[in-house]
Amino acid sequence: MRCEILSVGTELLLGDILNTNSQYLSRRLAELGIPVYFHTTVGDNPERLKKALEIAFSRSDMVIATGGLGPTQDDLTKEVSAEFFNKKLVLHEESLKRIKEFFEKRGLALTEGNIKQAYIVEGSRVIPNDWGTAPGIILEEGNKILILLPGPPKEMIPMFETYVVPYLLSFSSGIIHSRVLRVCGIGESFMEEKVKDLIKTQTNPTIAPYAKEGEAILRVTARADTKEEAEKMIERVVEEIRKRLGDYIYGEGETSLEEVVVDLLSKKSLTISIAESCTGGLISARLVNVPGVSKFFKGSLVAYDNEIKIRELNVPREIIEKYGAVSSQCAMKMAEGVAQKMGTDIGLSATGIAGPEGGTPEKPVGLVYIGLYIRGELSYKELRLSGDRNRIRLYTTINALDFLRRGLLNL
């Protein structure tokens, strides 16, 4: 099978951004035994994009195109692809639902451009985008295959690894099996550095790292004659990865961080209450996602105002006056106060500056403190986060749950 990589985007032609997608795809396709014969880059121009598709399919069996799936008027890869194959664009309801949920979760307004992203080429199969808004597609037409993926690497790479790789491997003989390790508490780059040599030397199984909203993921994939053989191959690699990453790995597969936390609370027969300031109830909402959590989670209090922290959580006024509401001292007192108020074994708290206003040189936007009280023992974690208000609140929530998880593991 001859493959061509088609990169779409005027910014690539102008040199405004580096085309890392082509490099990544070429390397991974080579590892999968699929030769890449051509690389083409074309701007956001419908006539030139259509011509690029004509040339590509005149010499290749499969074209993987990245970019041009965004919400703006010059994102036309799907439209041109539909025209090239003489097909219509049709609304994919499940993709529209995912996009709406993506925006609602972040408190953002949905635009017509975003709705446009839910349209797919008639007769194609959808590549779900769990990392952004634009779904990809796989279109088989005769003996030709077109695969469309978003341009942002943080979306393209995990979509390729999660959905496209199994599709491509289906053309080869044998069994394909994967395991996903979920990592929290370290960034994607730090995690990758820890296992860099394994990634470079492994061809079967392969190891693919990528990020997903405050956590990192490692997908280990093996090809073998039987599922049992593939599992054995994967287990050897997973065992080595676990030695290097330790309890940064919180789970496997589709296990969520909150599910792991609730499972630990259950095993240790502990109850918890939560005091939130900058997160405004997000931590509690994550825990409540887990069925059966009511046995362990007794309640929460959103103490946004300093007077509420003092009156309801018994945070000493002198602590706020001396150290401020955004401080380790305040966070720990909030955690202790909510545990005592609700009579729980554990108290968890979060206080910080989510922005966009409120920051100072000493305490910038993104400074967050997480407090933890476990049966009389107090601890805290300081975070220095970046991004907009919603991102800071989301990452605080994830870090708070992970800090709690680690506290429970140490009991």
Curated annotation (Swiss-Prot):
InterPro entries this protein is in?
Answer: CinA, CinA-like_C, CinA_C, CinA_KH, Competence-induced_CinA, MoaB/Mog-like_dom_sf, MoaB/Mog_dom
Supply the CDD domains for this chain.
cinA
Q: State the superkingdom.
A: Bacteria
- Similarity remark: Belongs to the CinA family.
Q: Which HAMAP family does the record match to this protein?
A: CinA_B
Q: What is this protein called?
A: CinA-like protein
